[in-house]
Amino acid sequence: MNRLNHSLPNVLHPMAHDEFPFVGILSANTLFIGVNIASRDRVEASLVGLGLVSRWEPGEPLVLPSAADTGTLILHEVGSLTHDDQVRLLAWLDQSAGRTRVVSTASASLFARVEAGLFLERLYYRLNTVSLNVAPGSEIRSAAGAAKQANKRQ
């Protein structure tokens, strides 16, 4: 997981509605929860590790604490969710009715996964208010190195 996956949500979380309207009306004093959801085991480990649930059984709905109701929830690697977990996440998002600010990350294009039938279109549009496509870290470092060399020559 690259640094942007961690740093961008940390920047967005404290911003007030009038500073950055698309991130919602939540204050910086609300809870910020990060969950790596790359696999079911990681979801359970993340939620249990944070003390949010005591256990999570397959087939049960994804339940997050009421504290997350008015905070920021970052979901890392949302593109790797199984179909069943996508349905659960969509149901939770529908139930939360916009009280929770959700930031999700994916290492692959979610739109391409929708087109391939691997990701729910409705969940894609529910999550995709603002999309940022960031080059892999290796490409960013390479471009930064080239820019540094060009500046030295001038």
Question: Predicted segment positions?
Answer:
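Conserved catalytic/coupling elements of P-loop NTPase cores
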Residues: 11, 20-154
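N-terminal pre-Walker A segment at the start of P-loop NTPase domains
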Residues: 1-14
